[in-house]
């Protein structure tokens, strides 16, 4: 019965789950064995097969992001993987995040985690929080829990591609190669997007495009064998 539940979880994940390898109990999450060049904490020099998804957007100044939970250029820890999507040991705990050096004129932040390698044709957004006040410069670990009580007042978690207003951990298909998880803090020149929690990540990014004035990114390249 346990195996069947894992198979169902992988199906619900639309190919983002761990697939047959985990259903059989043979899959394992590992750090990249490929050469990955990264400047710690700013995500500015990664080598990857696909273009940086932010390269297609208007250029904005970068600022610094860091974390006591995840490291730029290193795999996601197991706690940041998705038990919801069937990864054994995955806990769907959002990482601790802090940031500094953002542009003057910042009025709010959006925090997100995105996997451009997900086999959907449009990637997969694991987490989005909008309307984070400019006075907030950190989020504690597990701030992305369902019905979180540790997000700052006024912040809103969007439903995300999993259809749940919470952080959903990584769960790439076993054997699909490296997936680069972009954990991004976006600085906006508006205090609120005015968008509800049901807004898709794509629509949010479209609506805030002209309001983005800075961006900080931590990239975690990870694969499941």
Locate each region found by the language model:
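Short, flexible coil/linker elements and helix-boundary hinge sites characteristic
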Residues: 4, 15-17, 211
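N-terminus-centered regions that define maturation/targeting leaders and the start
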Residues: 24-225
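Bacterial N-terminal signal peptides
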Residues: 9-20
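Bacterial N-terminal signal peptides that target proteins for export
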Residues: 2-10
């Amino acid at each position: 019965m346990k195996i069947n539940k894992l198979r169902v979880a992988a199906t619900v994940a639309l190919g983002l789950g761990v697939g047959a390898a985990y259903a059989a109990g043979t899959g394992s999450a590992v750090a990249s064995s490929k050469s990955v060049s990264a400047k710690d904490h700013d995500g500015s020099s990664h080598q990857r097969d696909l273009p940086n998804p932010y390269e297609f957007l208007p250029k904005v100044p970068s600022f610094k992001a860091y974390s006591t939970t995840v490291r730029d250029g290193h795999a996601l820890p197991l706690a940041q993987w998705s038990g919801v999507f069937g990864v054994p040991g995955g806990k769907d705990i959002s990482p601790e995040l802090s940031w500094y050096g953002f542009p003057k004129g910042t009025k709010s932040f959006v925090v997100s985690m995105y996997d451009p390698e997900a086999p959907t044709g449009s990637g997969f957004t694991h987490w989005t929080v909008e309307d984070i006040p400019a006075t907030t410069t950190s989020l504690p670990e597990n701030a992305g829990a369902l019905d979180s009580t540790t997000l700052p007042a006024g912040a809103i978690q969007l439903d995300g591609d999993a259809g749940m207003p919470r952080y959903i951990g990584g769960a790439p298909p076993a054997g699909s190669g490296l997936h680069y998880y972009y954990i991004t803090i976006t600085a906006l020149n508006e205090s609120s997007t005015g968008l509800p929690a049901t807004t898709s990540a794509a629509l949010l990014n479209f609506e805030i495009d002209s309001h983005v004035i800075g961006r900080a990114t931590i990239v975690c390249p990870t694969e499941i064998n």
